[in-house]
Amino acid sequence: MPAQLTDWHDTSARQAIELTEYFLANFSVDVSRVYAAGYSAGGETMSQAVSMRPDLYAAYLHGASQWDGDYAPIAENGTAVYIFMAEHDEYYGSQRAWSAYNSLHDAYEEAGWSEEQISNVLQIQTPNDEWFAQRGVTSNYHGGGNVVFGEDDVLNWVLSHTKEENES
């Protein structure tokens, strides 16, 4: 269930958390299999929400966005993160994805995770123009990045994680 942005800051992040909590309280939900995804501005918000309450989420798909949340809480709670950004994203640029990846990797190391454990819970993909062309996207790589939500390997990776499994 998508939340609509009120802002790109704490207000929307807290509303996303409240929506998650509402579903957990009012529907039959496997609490070990709660997932989040954020794309573009929604990724800025969801990176904040997931870092504010990483205990709620087994995995998070961070698409075509910059990371505005904290890093340490993600690692401390073992939340799996898949970062996806076009190599030539016109809006954010792929360097922001790599910066988030490196900061999350450092946070996992500081939390005592081994390299093998980290590789199981942290992934990044920054596909090139040819990868997008094979999927019918030949320009506007930022907007075209939404093809990630149709990539079975990415979605299966996210859905393969459970809260108990991720805890080190």
Give residue ranges: language-model regions.
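Short alpha-helix in the alpha/beta-hydrolase fold that links the catalytic acid
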Residues: 92-110
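A conserved short beta-strand
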Residues: 55-67
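C-terminal catalytic histidine-bearing segment of alpha/beta-hydrolase fold enzymes
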Residues: 84, 90, 109-168
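Gly/Ser-rich "nucleophile elbow"/oxyanion-hole loop immediately N-terminal to the catalytic nucleophile
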Residues: 5-40
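Alpha/beta-hydrolase-fold catalytic nucleophile elbow
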Residues: 37, 62-64, 84
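Alpha-helical scaffolding within the catalytic cores
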Residues: 18-19, 44, 64-74
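Short glycine-enriched nucleophile-adjacent loop
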Residues: 43-54
